[in-house]
Regions:
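Acidic/histidine-rich, surface-exposed loop or edge segments in extracytoplasmic proteins
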Residues: 17-21, 101-117
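Short, non-transmembrane alpha-helical segments in secretory-pathway proteins
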Residues: 23-60, 116-157
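Generic low-complexity segments that are intrinsically disordered, proline-rich and/or Lys/Arg-biased
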Residues: 29, 95-96, 103-104
Length: 199
């Protein structure tokens, strides 16, 4: 009799444990948890990155009817340098098969528009690199070499003077009385103008 009662109690405890384990999802399913989990993962995978930010989050439904979030993040290394590296990282939450998509390199090794036949300067990092690597930017390239503390600020503009759809990238240095601004076309792989100013 005692054995039967003990077996019944163990069975009840086992069923209760199974119910608790399978009733609650392994990953909490809300947007804030997805963002938190993703940012923690980015901090671990890219500990030296200066910028790690979520650009987009979308809730989707998989073929089996379960809900998940698809996230896209920006990771930038060397944002204060002439050659910042920008990576886009994609992630599904909860993770599917624990196989993530490979990161997409937007800029790498001081190059823009990697594997793109027609270059569109869509991001700050691209504009900064283009401002001293495109044809016609020799003055800025020399300025950067002569001033190790040179830094750039980039602004996307709908219009500037007679130009439309441009980036303005201004290079300045505390150790120089000069600054340079490159006016770049967003879509034509072209330097439209180099402006030299005395500070």
């Amino acid at each position: 009799m005692k054995t039967v009662v003990l077996v019944v109690l163990l069975a009840i405890v086992a069923l209760g444990a199974i119910y608790i384990i399978f009733q609650q999802p392994a990953y909490p399913m809300n947007e804030n948890d997805a963002k938190k989990f993703f940012l923690e993962d980015l901090r671990e995978k890219y500990p030296n990155a200066g910028i790690r930010e979520i650009m987009d989050i979308t809730q989707l439904t998989s073929s089996d009817g379960s809900s998940y979030y698809q996230l896209k993040a920006r990771v930038t290394n060397g944002e204060g340098t002439p050659c910042p590296e920008r990576i886009h990282v994609y992630y599904d939450y909860p993770p599917k098969n624990y196989v993530s998509q490979p990161p997409e390199y937007i800029t790498k090794s001081c190059k823009v528009c990697i594997n793109e036949p027609h270059c569109i300067l869509a991001f700050t990092e691209e504009a900064i690199i283009a401002s001293h690597t495109y044809n016609g930017t020799g003055e800025i390239e020399k300025f950067i070499k002569d001033n190790s503390d040179a830094a750039a600020t980039a602004s996307a503009m709908d219009s500037y003077g007679n130009y439309t759809g441009v980036w303005l990238v201004k290079w300045s240095s505390p150790s120089s009385a000069l600054s340079y601004t490159a006016v770049l076309s967003k879509t034509q792989n072209t330097v439209l103008e180099i402006i030299k100013e005395s500070n």
